[in-house]
Amino acid sequence: MRLTQAFVRSAAYERRFLAKNPWDLAMVLWIPLATVLLIWWIFSQTQISDLPIGVIDQDQSPMANTLVRYLEASPDITIANFYNSPAAAKDGILQRDVYALVIIPENFSRNILSGKPSPIILQVNAQYGTHSGIIQKGVQSVAGTLSAGVEIQRLVKQGISPTQAAIAYSPINIQRTSLFNAATNYQQFLASTVIPALLHILAMVIGATTIGRELRDKQLGRWYRFIEGRSSKLSLATDDIVSTKNSANNHLTSSSVSNSNNIKDQSSRTNLTAPIAAVTKSVSISVLLAGLAGKYCWPALAYSLWALLAIWLATPQYPTAPSSLLATYIGLVLLMMLSLWLGAIFTLASFSLRAGLSATGFISAPSYAFAGVTFPYIAISDGAKHWSDMLPLTYYLKLHIAQLQMHAPLAVSLSIVYGLALATIIAMLLTALLSKRALANPQRWGAR
């Protein structure tokens, strides 16, 4: 009963604060919702196509015109402009009007007809890795198609049948089979993994600010006294401020009235802020755990809903096993809970909301880069691997990709779910211990 009371009173305490502070409420409700929908809308075009390139045609021959038509027909690229000089083309690349330049050299057609090598020059802005890779693939495909057609026509003129000419031109073929994400769906590849990463950041920020503002405003003791049932007033800090202002106004009116009000104000302060030593000596870890659970129940519930929305959006069009969906959702909810507790730990450990937010940003913001989604995990340095192995987002994304995109057996990812659950429990216990330490050191409250 005592723990239930602590949970309910702490939840009511936090609900009242959120109702009176729209920005904090927005961090729980509207900002994560807008983030999820915005990221999904940004990647609504699931495939990259029609990347603009420029062309310098120095040959002006029918064969060069054929190459230009092939380039324009490629789904990956589109010809945005024809340039007359390399200088003009360079300006186009620098201004990002085009991402690459195809140069058709002089005597292109003559060299082909005479059987001499006739290269196509591709200059690509490799600063944009994804763009350049797609453009290189598209131009190489066009060049291969045109080259095959020219060679097969030459062999047919020599009396070889078209079928034999095709085999003679390319006796070894590559049969490429994409096992996962065969359509190169960037919404499935990037958006579905970026959303959990951003929710991870927001949850850590909320975790830091929810307990951090109690330290900053020197209200941690009042909060604990309220959840423990020693005070029946919900808005303790507000009542204290009002009584202080009234005391100051009465002092200006009359010294006798002021003395009386000062005595009342002093007794009121004594009742509101009972001796801190008496509070800290009787701090119960179980009550703290229940109070912290109630304090964080609203962001936990909200982010469980956003996790459900993220999983629903990330679910591929083809069927996914219910067990895989459930395991992924549980993993994401555990990641959100762990993020809340980690944010609280960083703030409580430093006794400073500012330091807690700094640590939160330092750890959560770049965690996606170390998770092995955009850059291969096996290719990073050993030091980066050790750092990646300490980040909870790394393990969740392994679970996410394995279950939703690779359809791996559930047993492959169960260890990650168990690990996240254990880490969440440990983080919650550590938060309670650090809260007890903070209650025992009131002289360190008030740091920004």
Locations of the language-model features?
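Short, membrane-interfacial amphipathic segments enriched in basic
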Residues: 1-11, 282, 383-392
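Extracytoplasmic/periplasmic domains immediately adjacent to an N-terminal transmembrane anchor
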Residues: 1-188, 240-251, 255, 261-272, ...
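Membrane-spanning alpha-helical segments of multipass transporters and channels
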Residues: 301, 305-448
